Amino acid sequence: VAIASDIPELLSGISAIATTLRIGATRRMDTFSLADILERMVKRACLALPNAVVGTNDTEGERFASAIVPIAHQIEGLVSEETSQHWEATILVLLRLKAMPGFLAGRLQRHAGDQKLVSELEQEQAFARTLSPGNSHAWVAAWVQGFLGESGLALIYSDELFRTLDTWITGLDPI
């Protein structure tokens, strides 16, 4: 198993190999060996990710988020159903971890909702739990930033998410 500091490179390698497989398939190249390598790399990432993200700082969390989230689309149709399910299960395991940067936690929560790994109700409950008084304002702000990503459309489509965020913001002490 790779050590925690190698995981971003492993994720980057998964992305590169997935791209190569897609290009190779269109050019009718023999990609069997490469597909086997991709399977193994995804499985290795699934094993290593939970330990790798715990205790990372904000910068590393953003780096992990930008590497983890696209992989579901990149490996789609390139790995076995079992490996794909293992990847999805790993995302759900990551959602239950407590000691990771807010941005990464928020981005993973949004990704899980977008991929239908969690229900809309579970998404709303996670949002409400995150914005509860027990979490630091800085961590929550980073979580919301990660959750919203580059788009606040989730707030438009879910009145509950909007109300929860609005209640949290209006409840903050003015500076």
Predicted segments — roles?
Residues V1-I175:
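Extended repeat-based interaction scaffolds and adjacent low-complexity, acidic/S/T/P-biased segments
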